[in-house]
Amino acid sequence: MDGIFGSTGVWFLIGAILVWFMQAGFAMVETGFTRAKNAGNIIMKNLLDFCLGTIVFVLLGAGLLMGEDALFGLVGIPNMGVFTDFANYDWSNFFFNLVFCATTATIVSGAMAERTKFLSYCIYSLVISAVVYPIEAHWAWGGGWLSTAEPLFGTTGYFANVAYIDFAGSSLIHFVGGISSFIGALLLGPRWGKYLDKDGKPTLVRKEAKYV
């Protein structure tokens, strides 16, 4: 069978559900290495990564990722296919990319823990979910320029005619999330009050949130 109930669609859904549970894993890891007073803030930010990300991904991100190529394969053409082509829409692929979008955003929350205000983090989450992840994921997973580039390993052998493959998101998700985390930590600086006070003097390490 084709579509969401075909073998590919079912496999996409199973994989997507497993990835979705990574949100809980991220929440436990991050609350485990932050102070107990910030545990609620961390969990709420991880929850909003998915909630806010879903809204902007439906409205804009899905079109940029899965839409028809534009600008030499750099972006997809934004569309409202999720609403206008409801019956024939590729829902399994949509959900698969939605949870990966949330994962990309949540990777950064660990680096931003105890460094940002809640509103500032929400703005970041909207931007990476609506624009950053959809555009760079389109390059390889949406038929963009990386997936249609000249073969990297020639036209013969096991990797014949392969341009670029990211099987599980090592570059599109984890590399992008890591780079975003590094930039954010570099711009914001250390977590004042956890190890050093504002005068640079060591502080007593307080009780951590023992969720992990």
Residue ranges and their predicted role:
Residues M1-V212:
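Hydrophobic alpha-helical transmembrane bundles of multi-pass membrane proteins
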